[in-house]
Structures are given as structure tokens and as C-alpha cells.
Amino acid sequence: MKRMLINATQQEELRVALVDGQRLYDLDIEHSGSEQKKSNIYKGKITRIEPSLEAAFVDYGEEKNGFLPLKEISKNYFPENHIETLGFNIKNVLQEGQEVIVQISKEERGTKGAALTTFISLAGSYLVLMPNSPKSGGISRRIEGNDRIALKELLTLLELPEEMSLIIRTAGAGKSIESLRWDLSLRLQHWKTIQIIAKSRTAPFLIHQESNIIVRAFRDYLRQDIGEILIDNPKILDLARKHITFLGRPDFVNKIKLYSGEVPLFSYFQIETQINSAFQRKVRLPSGGSIMVDSTEALTAIDINSSRSTSGTDIASTAFNTNLEAVDEISRQLRLRDLGGLIVIDFIDMSAISHQRAIENRLREIARDDRARIQIGQISRFGLLEMSRQRLSSSLGESSHHICPRCTGTGTIRDNESLSLSILRLIEEEALKENTYEVRAIVPVEIACYLLNEKRDAVHAIEKRQAGGKTIIVPSKKMKTPHYSVSRIRKSESKNYTRYGLSNIRQSKITSFLKKNLLKKKQKEILDVANFNFYDNCYNKIQEAQENILKKNNYNNILLKVLSNNRNFIFKMITWFKNSFFIKNMLITSDIFKKNTLKNTNNIFFKKKYSSLNKKNNNQKKRVILSKLFEANIENIPLKNKKLDTSSANYLYDNIERKKNITKKNDLIQKNIHENSYLKHVLMNRYNVINIINNNYIFYKIFNRTKIFKNQNTNNSFLKFSSVTSPIFIFSSVFSLELALGKVWIKYPIAILDETKKQKKLNRKQILHISSISETNTIVNKNNYSGIKKIKHETYSFKKYVKNNIQNQEVTQSQLIKRTKKRNVFILDKKNFLYKRTCNRKNKIHQSSAPITKISKQSDLNKKEKEFHYNLSMMKSSLRGKNSAGVHSATNFSNSPVSKLK
């Protein structure tokens, strides 16, 4: 009994086999990555017309353009006034850029593109519709006798549109007129759908794709003699039943069964060995003979050998029986391998003409069962028979094999001795050329051993003939015969010597060792901030962790370490480039630092006064406290000293303190601000980024914005003032990596400061002509009573708000501020910026009679005086006041009362 076996256990490969008992007679294999393209319908565009070939090249959406000959162009594309009797040039039929509907008639092979046709054919279960071929109708040649006569009568009853034709397939034999009409209606509807899709889009694109292997198997292979269809996959079983019903073959639904045996389906029917024979060059015959199958670009050659065959009584009978046995196996191998094109068979010599005719008749008889069209010739006087077979799809070898990289498809390679002598002659030829400095030959190890041992004298003679030239032979383990490389180096070219494989290995090991050591040096131990738990005792724990960090590391290396914590490569690159830009624009060279910065001093960023004193709260003593627990022990930070753009607002850095000033001199840790409250509002703020610095300190990266400052320009000069006290605002501000990202959102706390009556009285006695800056960005002169009254009113309102809101009395958080990248920076010392009365007289001693705007002498900057401790970046106001002698305009300073802190 004949069966159809479908193996679908492996999703990468689907196999369909037709067996007669346990003999395999047809096979179809489809791989997941190489679906069949034949019979696919595309809308293509003419890219080039070649009159010499009478053909056109069509772009249909694949890598290689398709080949469309003139004979495969339908008359629908011909001009209306053409005459059939006259010859037509393809240039008069098609034009470049014209869109056509084409179907693939032959698959791509090697470097050749697919063969195309405009004569579309739509295959169904019982018939094939050809919508633009009016003269191609007929009945399958396999249908004979009464069935053929009956089908001719049924063809006249089918209603077919004009300029269309159809072919009744072998499966249509014995079918009723209703079945044929149903199949025809499906094909007509399919053609209408193709035309609608083709008009909807421009070329190139795929219109219709040929069905998968299961649908093709049911459509092409199902015949009445198939008694059973076995499938070893339940999912494919359900799919097969749906397809077979849709194809109009309900008589086969009950024949579909699920195979659930423990032994694989193909192994159970013992056909795996027969399938493997389709991949081999040599196929054994039952009598002991063999056939050899060799495929080339031009044709497929099949040779028959008797070998140890003893099937006959004499030589003639043995040759005849072996050839007769080979004919059956050849026809089977042609179907299994799906070989197409020209095929030449070399039979064993037979002197009897009757034997030759018997072989030809047997081959024609077997070919009738083949789906492909086959044309068979006669055995020539040389014992060769020529035949051609229709190429239905890519052969099994083309879809499953690849060219051998060593022999490049020839099947043989040159022996070592012959190859060595050929390389030696090539070296000698290259050495004889003029201006040759060196000839290098990279060869396999076997060839190198032969040349350096057996042909040592010949190589030495070539070097002598070079007159100072060199001949270098390098063995390569990676290279196998017959591959080699011979190159010629001229005297003017670079002379980088080719090294042996061992040297390359050593060099790679050395470089990898050095890279590891460099990485170890660069990637020092970094404190993981994510593992910290900030609670009441967090400050002590942070101090303990700081002791394990290496000290005095460069700021650039610190940034690299922070970046190395992030595993995202893209984030690293973006942050690195932006941070480099930040350092380049913010940190200046040591030369500029020496000119404009006092030695042995630490600088902080200064912000001007926000509120004035209130008479009602004279006895209260509150100070602004933000960064009371952390300090930055940075000395001589170089910052770029240039005129900064302050068109929008002044953004200041401040509160970088020494630890000694925090713990000893400055009374920053007050009863008003508790440590837990500070940690809650600052440390646990998710907008603040904590960075652990190896210089034994920790600081926050925050930027503050003030709306109090009036738009001003800075000058490239610094002045020295004595140490005096004054009520000021200290905002938490530290460098941030997030500055490199362009924008930062920050929260920062503030508190209020009031001084005593005694301090107010001392402030009123100050001689310096100074003025105050209000919240509305206006400068208020001390004689402007209305302005001072307005400031006091605003201050009183603010004090009243804080007093009513007890929770906000200690710490008041400002709103979130969006921080852009370009900002203004000023540097000042972070000590109490206040004036003493005694310092005013000393300042007058150092003042000249003529006003100056810049200190030009470096010696003045290097003077050491006990009373001078600060660097001040002066800000020039748009309102011009009377300049004091020896300094900038004093209108840039606060007019608020100043006094000494107790």
C-alpha cells in the first residue's frame, strides 16, 4: 500500500515522503530558512532592456533582478497596433520603469537570477487556470482512455472568460462537473484578488506566495492509490485536515492519521537509509553494481559501473541486467534529488540493438509516473543517453549543500610536492622583478617543511639572485593546502615583518597582561553609596567608610570612577563627553590660577543677602544651616576666570567648608536644626546625588538658583578684605555629575537669621558707603527710605509666616528648580563675610588717590597680611556709584547692618 508520511518533529525541517511498502519513491524537504519561490507572483519594475538578448531585467524585490525574455511577455503588454506576422523588438514592447505582473518560472541558481514570465498560472486541486494564455488549455497527458474523452466533454460545459484557458490535472480524472466548477470559481476569485492588490501599490512587492509544503503535497501528490496519510505531530495534523478540506478533497480526510509510536516515523518504515543515499555521490545497486551522480553547471552526469555484479551468465547479459537495474534507480534518484535540466547517462556498453531499445522503453515507462516533464533521447553509438527533466524547484543538493572551502567544489586538491614546486617558481618570478626588497610566502606547515628542507638550496639561490633581497617563508597552522599567499614588498614600501603564530600569541598575552594591570590601577576601590542606610548615626558610619578610601585622588579620576559604576555603555559615553566639557569650561589651568587666586586659601561661592533684620526678634539668634555635617577639603581648586554671561540669573556655588571651620570656629550645629531633620530633608532627597570622594570628604552635588540678583557682569580681579562678620545666606551647593546631563532638579532647605540690637547699632555706625539689594532685583541706597521700608515690610511678612508655621521655622524647603547647563560661577572664601570698624582704617591706608579697576601686579596678590583672608569676585552693577579709591565700586556690596558674631 502506498502511503504519505509527514515528519514534523523538528521545526527547522519539514519532510514529506511517499513510500510503496518500504520503498521510497518520492521526497520533498523544506527548510525553515529556504522556502520555495517558484510560482510566487510579484509586481516588478523594468530596470534594463537588453536588445541583444531580446530580454529585460526586472526588479521584483529580491537581491538579484529577474530575467524576462521576449517570448514570455503576454500580448496584454504589446502595443495596440502591433502585427503578429512582423517581428517585434523588445524595445517597442517594454520601457524602462514600466510595471509588470510576473511569476517565477525557474528558481535562482548560483549567480543566475530567477527566470520570469508574464503568463500567470494558478494551480488548483483539479485544474490549473491561466488567465492571460487563451491558447494553452488541455488535459493532463497522464489521463488516457475513457477518462480523457469524458473530460473533453466537461470542458465545453465549463464557463470560462475570454482570453483565459485551463488545464485539467490528473487528480481531476473521474470528477463531476460540480467539483470542476467549484475549483474553477476559486481560481477566478484568486485572480481577481491578485489584480486588486497589484493596483493598490507600486512595484516592487510580493503579491502571492506559494503555499507551504503540506498544501503543495496535498495538491500535487494526492492520488486515489494513496491509502494512508501519517503525521507525527498533532499540531500539523489539525492543520492538514483544515487544508485538505479547503482544497476540496474531503475523501482524504478519513485517511489522515496521527502516528504516535515510540520509533520515529521514517525509521519505522526503514526509509532513513534511502533518504541518506540521496545526499551521496555513489549509490549501490542490489546486484552489486553502482551509479555515480555528478552535478555541474552545464548538466548532470550519471555513470553506471558493474563493479562486482554477477547478474548475468555472460558479459552481454551482465551489462544488460545491470543497466536495466540502474534505470529504475536513476529514475528514483532524479525524483528524490529533484534534479532538473540536461542529464547524460553513460550506460555500460551493449552491442545488441534490442538491449538498447529495451533500456530506452523502460526509462520512458518509468518517467510517466514523474510529475516533471521529461524528454528522452536515444542511446548513441558512444553508449550515452541524453534526457531533460523539468526543474520544479531547487535540487536537494542546492538547498542542503555548500561548496567545500578547501577544494572549492572540484573534489580534489593538489599534492604537497607539486604545490611546493609551484610556489617556489612563483617566489622566483616575484624576486626577479625590479625594485624588489622582499618576497613573503605564507604557506601551510607541510609546504614550509618541504621548501625549507628539500629545497633549501633553491631558496638560497633565489636570495643571491635578488642582490640583497630577502625571501621569507612563514608556516601557518591555520592555512591548509592548496591555499597559500605570496606577496612582493618594494623598497619604498613599509617593511613590517610578518611574525610567526607563536610570536603573535605571546604578544597578545603580554598586551592583555598590561591592560589588566592598567585597569587595576585605574579602578580603585569605590565606596558603594547604595549600601548606606542613613539614620540617626549615619554620620559616624560614613566617617568609618571614608577611612577605607584612598586619599588625594585627582578629580578627573573621581569622575571616571563614578562613571564606571554604571553598566550602561551609552550612558557612560554621554556622561563622559558632557562631563569633559564641564571640566574644560569650569576648571582652568594653573597659570590663570596663579594670577588670580590667593595661595593657601579655600574658596566658596557667595550669595548676597536675602532678608534684613527685624526689630521684634532682636534676641533671637538663628543662622542658615544647610551643609553642617559635610565638608570639602579641597585646596586651590582652579576655576576659569572670565567674564560670565549673567543675562538670565546668577547661579552660585556656596558652602564648601573645611572640617575645622565647621567643628571649631563656625557655630553651625545649632539647636534649631536637628541632625535627623537635616538627614530627612537633604540626604534622603532622591534628587540629590551623593558621591564619595577619595580625598577624605563627602559632598552633595546640588545647584541653587537665586532670583535676588540683578543682571550684572563680573571683572577679572580679586580684592582682599579683613575678617568681619555679617548675617548671610548659605545655600547648599556642590558640584554635580548631573550638570553634565544638561538639567537638574533640586530641593534645598533654608533658615532665617536675626541679630541682636547691639549688632544692629554697630552696623549703623559703619562708614562704608554700601547699599542693599532687594528681592525685586533692585539696588536700594541707604538714603532711600521708601526702598528700605519696603524691604523691612517684606522681611516682617516673611518672619510672620515662619513664626506661624512652626514646622518650617527650622528648615524651609524651596521649590524645585530646573537647572540648565550654562551657568554663572563666582568664587569666594567660605568664612564669615563681615566687617569690623577697625578694618576700615587699615583699608584706607592701602588705598590710592586714583581709582583703579584691576590689580595687575602679581606681587600684590602674594602679599601676606594678617587682616586679609578672602578673595572676593566683585560684581559690577548697572547703577554707577562713586568709586572708592583703590577698589571697585562699593555699590556692589550689601547695605544690611553688619556686626561681629559672638
From Swiss-Prot:
Residues 889-902 have a biased composition (Polar residues). It is found in: Cytoplasm; Cell inner membrane. GO terms for biological process: mRNA catabolic process; rRNA processing; tRNA processing. Keywords: Cell inner membrane, Cell membrane, Cytoplasm, Endonuclease, Hydrolase, Magnesium, Membrane, Metal-binding, Nuclease, RNA-binding, rRNA processing, rRNA-binding, tRNA processing, tRNA-binding, Zinc. One of its GO terms (molecular function) is magnesium ion binding. Gene3D superfamilies: Nucleic acid-binding proteins, Ribonuclease E, catalytic domain. It catalyses: Endonucleolytic cleavage of single-stranded RNA in A- and U-rich regions. Binds 2 Zn(2+) ions per homotetramer. Binds 1 Mg(2+) ion per subunit. Residues 39-119 form the S1 motif domain. Zn(2+) binds at C404, C407. Mg(2+) binds at D303, D346. Its main location: cytoplasm. It comes from the Bacteria. Residues 881-902 are annotated as: Disordered. Residues 404-407 are annotated as: Required for zinc-mediated homotetramerization and catalytic activity. Its EC number is 3.1.26.12. Its cofactor is Zn(2+); Mg(2+). Component of the RNA degradosome, which is a multiprotein complex involved in RNA processing and mRNA degradation. Within the RNA degradosome, RNase E assembles into a homotetramer formed by a dimer of dimers. Belongs to the RNase E/G family. RNase E subfamily. Endoribonuclease that plays a central role in RNA processing and decay. Required for the maturation of 5S and 16S rRNAs and the majority of tRNAs. Also involved in the degradation of most mRNAs. This is Ribonuclease E. It comes from Buchnera aphidicola subsp. Acyrthosiphon pisum (strain APS) (Acyrthosiphon pisum symbiotic bacterium).
